[in-house]
Amino acid sequence: MSESHERHGIDGAAERDASDPRDEADTQANHTGVSRRSMLTASALAAATLAGRAAQAQQRAPSVAADSVAGRPFRALVRSGSTASIEDLRLRDIGPRQVLVRTTASCGCYTITRTVLGNRNVDTPTIPNHSGFGVVEAVGAEVHRVRTGDRVLVCGTPECGQCYQCLHGNPEACNYLNSQLFNAPIADMADGTGVIQQAAIGGLSELMVALEEYCIPLFTDLPDEQLALLGDTLAAGLASTMTYGRVEGGSDVVIFGAGPIGLAAVQGARSQSAGQIIVIEPVAYRRDKALELGATTVLDPNDDTDSLVQRIREMCYGPTDRLDAGGRYGPGYRYGGADFVIEASGGDLFPPAVETGPDPTGLLALRQSWEVTRGGGHLTLLAAGQQGEISFPTAQFCLSTRSIHGGQMGGMHPMRDAPRYVKMIERGAIDAAAVITATYPLEGVVAGFQRVADRTELGVVFTFG
C-alpha cells in the first residue's frame, strides 16, 4: 500500500466487509439473490428491447458471470494466529459488485512482513497483501468497469468516483478505503472456517475477490511482474512526485530512503526534470541503485548524523543570496532547504541483515525530512513503521509555510494515474524492471518476505502459474 501505508489495512487489523452499506437493497440481495440495481438494469434492458434497440443495449451491458463460482478450489497463503501457511481453499460465490481475479503477480511490500512472518496475531484466518495483478475470470451482474478476460490491477487504493472524497478531487482518500468493514469471508478452509482478505484484496493467493472500485483495467503488453508494482510501491513513489508534491523542473528534491518506493520517487523526480535529487540511504547497494536511476547525490545518514540537515540545506542554497536577484535565502534565513522532500524510509520492523541507519525507530529521519524542507516547500510522508511520537517547534510548524502531505500511495488517483504510468514505462521514462531483484512462486512467499524483511532484496514480486 514500503514502506507502504497503515490505511491499507496492512497489519491485519483493518480488514473490511465486502458488503456495501450505501444500498440497503443490495444487502437484502444476499438473501434473495436479486438486488435493486440488478432489477433496474434488467428493466432498462427490457425497455431497450421494446424500442428495437436490444443489440445496442446488450453491447453496453457489462460482462457477467454465467455460472456460480462457489466451490472452486485454489491455494493461498493464510495467516491464522501467529503462523502463516499455504492452504487449500474453496471459493464462496461472489456478490453482484465483486470481481473474481486469477492472480498472476503480487508485489512484496515491506509492511506486509509483519503479517507474513508472524510477529503479531491475526484473529481471523486472513490472506495477506493489499495489492495484486491478474486476469478477470468472472464479474458480478452489476460490475461495469471491467470484463471477463481483462488484465487488471487490484490497487491498494480504491476509487469509486461517487463518494464525498472522490467528488471533491481526493480519490486517494476514497471512502471505500477506511469507512467500510470489508470482513466477509470469500472462501473456506477444509474444516469450513471462513477466510477473509487483508485490505479486501489478499494478493498472496491464486484468486482474489475484489469490489470493482479496487480494479483498474490496463491495456498493455507489459509483463505482469512490472504491472503488479503499480498497485503499491512503484505507484506510490511516482505519485509522490506528480500528485501531492508536483516536482517542478530545476527544483531541489530530497528523498529519505532508497527502497522500492524511494527509488520510484527518484525516477519520478528525474522524469519531472528535477535539478537536483539528493537521496539519504544507509544501505550501500541501494545508494548505488539510486545513482543508477537518476539521483545526483547520495548520502549515508550514518556519516555526520548531527550535521546532515545543515549539509543538505547548504546543497540547496542556490547560486546567490541576493534576494533582489532571485536568491532563495538571505542572511539569517531560518527555513532553508529543498523544494520537495519525500520521506520513504520508515522504521525497522525487523533487524536488517545489511547496513543499519542511525535510528531504527524511524523518528530521526521523519524529523530530518521536515527540517530540510524549505519554507513554502512540500513534504510528503510515505513510509510506515515509525515507533513512538515526535514533536515540532510550534512557531516553526505554524509559520514556516511548509506543506505536509500524508502519503496514501503518494496521492495516486488510481484510474487516472495507473494508465499514464503504464505509458511512461512503455516509452522508457520509468524503468520498472530495475527495481525487481527477485521473483518467487506462491510456495516461496515466506522465504521471499524474509528477504524483504532483511532488506537484502530491493524489490520482490510473487508470481502465480
Put a short name on every predicted segment.
Residues E3, D321, Y335, G347, ...:
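C-terminal substrate-binding/catalytic core of Rossmann-like NAD(P)-dependent dehydrogenases/reductases
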Residues A46, E206, Y214, F219-D306, ...:
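Mid-domain Rossmann-like dinucleotide-binding core that forms the NAD(H)/NADP(H) cofactor-binding site
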Residues M1-V34:
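N-terminal secretory signal peptides
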Residues R114, C160-F256:
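NAD(P)H dinucleotide-binding glycine-rich loop of Rossmann-like/cofactor-binding domains
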Residues G245-G249, Q272, L293-S403:
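Glycine-rich cofactor phosphate-binding loops and adjacent beta1-alpha1 units
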Residues E3-H5, H31-F133, G202, E206-A210, ...:
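Short N-terminal strand-loop motif that marks the start
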Residues T49-R72, R322-L323, P331, Y335, ...:
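C-terminal capping/lid region of NAD(P)-dependent oxidoreductase domains
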Residues R92-C107, V116-L167, E172, F219-D221:
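Glycine-rich beta-strand-centered segment in the early N-terminal region that forms part
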